[in-house]
Amino acid sequence: MLKKLCVILFISSITINSHAKNMYDNVDTATSYDSTYYENEGSLVFKMRLGGIFASAKQKGLPTHSSVQPVSVGEIAKNGYGGDASTTIFFNNYLAAELSLGFNVLRTKYTSLAAVAHNYGINNVKLGKHKPIYMIPATLTGQFHIAPYGGIRPYIGIGYHGSYMLTQATGLKIRNGYNAVGQIGVDFYAKDDTLINIDVRQFFLKPKLEYKSNLVGNKKVTSKVKLNPLIVSIGIGFTF
């Protein structure tokens, strides 16, 4: 459902901007049109965003267990929230590069940790309070701005990220990860060099998990977790 809404938003933005361009081309220069309206932005854009994170967190590659009555492990993390700051450099009206640094929080599912303990090691382990998984991605994205005129400007992008991962969850260690990222968004420009940004990014991320001895005893239990977080953000930007 969320991806369908993104597609609708993207197509709507293209339609609006195509109509805006036609109107702009037909405006006579002798009219009262303000030529500086939306035309005074610079080649640098700084953005700050907050958003929600949707992650599947499915595990793959768990070793064969010896439990007589095994239980399903399920997803290791819940959806979360986060934010990022970015700088976009425009090479021309259509092409740009965005460098961003984010901080995201996912909640671990202790039912999954308890299932791992049951299947591979220590039963009835006390896990304490929920502890988050932190994802800190540094991302470089190449962008194509489809309609770089008017007040509504959609863009698409593709890039690469390296994500520093850590957690305070009992019995769990998560490795860093890196992979591709896809991006789609819209900038809504105002007259005073500010903008509102709606941004959707699909991160591809499969970090390695390692379970500690307090969960699995002296066994070595590792897996790959398919996080692939989808981050939907809204924020404010400033042009320079």
From Swiss-Prot:
Keywords: Cell outer membrane, Membrane, Signal, Transmembrane, Transmembrane beta strand
GO CC list: cell outer membrane
Main location as per UniProt: membrane
Cited Gene3D superfamilies: 2.40.160.20
Location(s) in or outside the cell: Cell outer membrane
GO process annotations (BP): transmembrane transport
InterPro entries: OMP/PagP_b-brl (IPR011250), OMPW (IPR005618)
Signal peptide positions on this chain: 1-20
SUPFAM superfamilies assigned to the protein according to its UniProt record, in alphabetical order: OMPA-like (SSF56925)
Family per similarity comment: Belongs to the OmpW/AlkL family.
PANTHER family noted in UniProt: OUTER MEMBRANE PROTEIN W (PTHR36920:SF1), PTHR36920
Protein name stated in the entry: Putative outer membrane protein RT0057
Native source species: Rickettsia typhi (strain ATCC VR-144 / Wilmington)
